[in-house]
């Protein structure tokens, strides 16, 4: 059940020189009579892994494979520092015993076989991404130049738009040949022009609605509807008050006097002062317009000025009569 001294010495030597693993296995097998269960117990191997111990070099990787695994592992570490297997060191047979290297390489190869394809895909995509970006950049930069219309072209297009807002294909083709433009450009111009026309129509409609909306009415005191004889007193707005007091009766104002009281007998009266009584009564059911000032006539001159004016008119008439009489006397026959 115990190993011989030769076997232990060979195990110690194998720890120092892993290349002597086959000789160590052969010596141990010869010494213990092909009984390797103690080593299996120490290393934790099962009976199914016995052939692996007997033939340790069967599943080991070759030198090119090791180089490829190391290079891919370095790429995975550089490209993906958070890779779950990126921190696993690659073991070599020169650092540890051969059986440890065999098991570690088997585990690492089995676990990384599924990851190698992903690493290769990532590396290929990283290599191809700059080229694809260079190919996609010209596509993004490619943009159609804006069409600059001349004055003649715009004039012809506007004339055609006045005739019809929706010209057919034949009309557009004829117009395109006339103005030396592609038919597609003409079609796009008509689309833009119709959109502009619709916006203008909406603006005009909104302006008309604002213009037709009722204006705000002024808050005025209620007015009496009985516009009868001129002697009736009418309520005056505070901003229309005359220098006279509001308690002054209307018939005392010179403007509301009758034609016989305010004028002399020889001076003809005006028509608006000779309004009959029946006409004033017929105006009773009529109401004044909503935005019209009340019919209140205020004289600009005081009462003294009116008296002086009437007296001056009378004196002028007297002077005229005297002058006519004097002229008649001078033209009498001698």
From Swiss-Prot:
One of its GO terms (molecular function) is RNA polymerase II cis-regulatory region sequence-specific DNA binding. The keyword DNA-binding applies. A motif (Nuclear localization signal) lies at residues 317-321. It is found in: Nucleus. Residues 118-131 have a biased composition (Basic and acidic residues). Belongs to the paired homeobox family. Bicoid subfamily. One of its GO terms (biological process) is positive regulation of transcription by RNA polymerase II. Residues 142-201 bind DNA. Plays a critical role in eye formation by regulating the initial specification of retinal cells and/or their subsequent proliferation. A motif (Octapeptide motif) lies at residues 37-44. InterPro entries: HD, Homeobox_CS, Homeodomain-like_sf, OAR_dom, RAX/RAX2. The lineage of its organism: Eukaryota, Metazoa, Chordata, Craniata, Vertebrata. The gene is rx1. It comes from the Eukaryota. One of its GO terms (cellular component) is nucleus. Its main location: nucleus. A motif (OAR) lies at residues 311-324. This is Retinal homeobox protein Rx1. SUPFAM superfamilies: Homeodomain-like. Pfam families: Homeodomain, OAR. Keywords: Developmental protein, DNA-binding, Homeobox, Nucleus, Transcription, Transcription regulation. Residues 76-97, 118-147 are annotated as: Disordered. It comes from Psalidodon fasciatus (Banded astyanax). PROSITE patterns: HOMEOBOX_1, HOMEOBOX_2, OAR.
């Amino acid at each position: 059940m115990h190993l011989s001294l030769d076997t232990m010495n060979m195990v110690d030597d194998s720890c120092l020189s892993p290349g002597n693993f086959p000789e160590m296995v052969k010596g141990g097998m010869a010494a213990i009579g092909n009984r390797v269960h103690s080593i299996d117990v120490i290393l934790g191997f099962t009976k199914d892994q016995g052939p692996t111990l007997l033939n340790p070099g069967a599943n080991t990787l070759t030198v090119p494979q090791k180089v490829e695994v190391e290079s891919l592992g370095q790429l995975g570490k550089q490209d993906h520092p958070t890779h779950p297997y990126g921190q696993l060191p690659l073991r070599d047979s020169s650092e540890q015993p051969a059986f440890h290297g065999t098991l570690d390489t088997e585990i690492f190869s089995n676990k990384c076989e599924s990851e190698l394809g992903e690493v290769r895909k990532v590396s290929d995509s990283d290599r191809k991404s700059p080229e694809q970006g260079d190919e996609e950049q010209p596509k993004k930069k490619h943009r159609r130049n804006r069409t600059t219309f001349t004055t003649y072209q715009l004039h012809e297009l506007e004339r055609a738009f006045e005739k019809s807002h929706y010209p057919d294909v034949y009309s557009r083709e004829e117009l395109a040949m006339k103005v030396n433009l592609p038919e597609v450009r003409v079609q796009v111009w008509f689309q833009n022009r119709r959109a502009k026309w619709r916006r203008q129509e909406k603006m005009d409609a909104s302006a008309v609605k604002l213009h037709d909306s009722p204006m705000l009415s002024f808050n005025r005191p209620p007015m009496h509807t009985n516009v009868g004889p001129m002697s009736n007193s009418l309520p005056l707005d505070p901003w229309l008050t005359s220098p006279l007091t509001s308690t002054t009766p209307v018939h005392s104002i010179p403007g509301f006097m009758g034609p016989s009281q305010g004028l002399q007998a020889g001076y003809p009266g005006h028509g608006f002062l000779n309004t009959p009584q029946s006409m004033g009564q017929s105006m009773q059911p009529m109401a004044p317009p909503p935005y019209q000032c009340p019919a209140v006539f205020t004289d600009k001159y005081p009462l003294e000025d009116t008296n002086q004016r009437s007296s001056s008119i009378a004196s002028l008439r007297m002077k005229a009569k005297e002058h006519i009489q004097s002229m008649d006397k001078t033209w009498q026959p001698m």
